[in-house]
């Protein structure tokens, strides 16, 4: 099964993000926008994982994060990963709490590499993906094509989740496989 590990957001934060993006979503249907319920910060993409290996990954999550405290983050500016100067991925950066998120990702990276998962070559950038360029769209965007004003409150991240991702023609469906609650 296709899996990834991520930080889950409170529903009210997802809703606030979507309200802020509403006009851009209407104005730019050429982009593939992430659905509201699927908003998250990926810590580690695992790819295809044999079913029998999934419980061991859940056990590792428990081992790494059980007893950790919930932490506060604040999302920042809308930014883009580019390909030849054009927007490939549109994302929201982390203004506060990014160091803690990096620490979580690094701990996962170290632990999961011992289980045979490939280490990421690129440096981890904590971010929330909000849209991707469609491969076959004729419309291309530059970073300054976006005017998104975010005014989101700080919020607590209190769970780290192992997700199963099922790809469908209408978009991915995420299912929680394992949830590790962070303490108050």
Tell what function each PLM region has.
Residues 1-184:
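Histidine-dependent nucleotide/RNA phosphoesterase domain, centered on the 2H-phosphoesterase fold
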């Amino acid at each position: 099964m296709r899996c990834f590990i991520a930080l889950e957001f409170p529903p009210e934060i997802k809703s606030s993000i979507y309200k802020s993006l509403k006009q851009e979503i209407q104005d730019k249907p050429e982009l593939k926008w992430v659905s509201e319920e699927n908003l998250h910060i990926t810590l580690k993409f695992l790819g295809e994982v044999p079913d029998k290996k999934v419980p061991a990954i859940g056990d590792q999550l428990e081992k790494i994060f059980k007893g950790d405290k919930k932490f506060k983050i604040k999302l920042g500016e809308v930014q883009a990963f580019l390909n030849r100067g054009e927007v490939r991925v549109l994302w929201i950066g982390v203004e506060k709490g990014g160091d803690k998120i990096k620490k979580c990702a690094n701990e996962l990276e170290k632990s999961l590499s011992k289980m045979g998962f490939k280490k990421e070559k690129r440096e981890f950038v904590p971010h929330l993906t909000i849209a991707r360029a469609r491969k076959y769209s004729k419309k291309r965007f530059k970073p300054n094509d976006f005017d998104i004003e975010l005014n989101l409150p700080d919020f607590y991240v209190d769970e780290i989740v192992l997700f199963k991702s099922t790809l469908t023609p209408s978009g991915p469906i995420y299912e929680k496989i394992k949830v590790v609650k962070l303490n108050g």
